[in-house]
């Protein structure tokens, strides 16, 4: 009984791999998927804060302020700032000088 497998066979006094079917489309597809998975995983680890912040808050920029009086713009800015200052039911009081 031999301990050698089909993959590990002695070829010319060295251990090697017989890869006669390396042009098989399934092997090529699996290699491409593996490489893409590795690239996406690396990008995810490098930029996870930016990526998940975009998913959480979206790309909201707010409504256009064109044609709106400056007093209303300032009121809207204060409302938005107070909404940002509230963090998971912990409200932050900011005193202006």
From Swiss-Prot:
Stated regulation of activity: The M2 protein from most influenza A strains is inhibited by amantadine and rimantadine, resulting in viral uncoating incapacity. Emergence of amantadine-resistant variants is usually rapid.
Lipid attachment in record (S-palmitoyl cysteine): 50
Residue intervals passing through the bilayer: 23-43
A Pfam family hit: Flu_M2
Annotated glycosylation sites: 20
InterPro entries, alphabetized: Flu_M2
Site feature Essential for channel activity, possibly by being protonated during channel activation, and by forming the channel gate and the selective filter, where: 37
Annotated GO MF terms: monoatomic ion channel activity; proton transmembrane transporter activity
Intravirion topological domain: 44-97
GO biological process: protein complex oligomerization; symbiont genome entry into host cell via pore formation in plasma membrane; symbiont-mediated suppression of host autophagy
Cellular compartments per GO CC: host cell plasma membrane; membrane; virion membrane
Biased composition (Basic and acidic residues): 71-80
Residue positions where Phosphoserine is found in the record: 64, 82
Membrane topology category: Single-pass type III membrane protein
Subcellular location field: Virion membrane; Host apical cell membrane
Oligomer status and interactors: Homotetramer; composed of two disulfide-linked dimers held together by non-covalent interactions. May interact with matrix protein 1.
Purpose of the protein: Forms a proton-selective ion channel that is necessary for the efficient release of the viral genome during virus entry. After attaching to the cell surface, the virion enters the cell by endocytosis. Acidification of the endosome triggers M2 ion channel activity.
Free-text note on domains in this protein's UniProt record: Cytoplasmic tail plays an important role in virion assembly and morphogenesis.
Name of the protein in question: Matrix protein 2
Annotated source species: Influenza A virus (strain A/Malaysia:Malaya/302/1954 H1N1)
Gene label: M
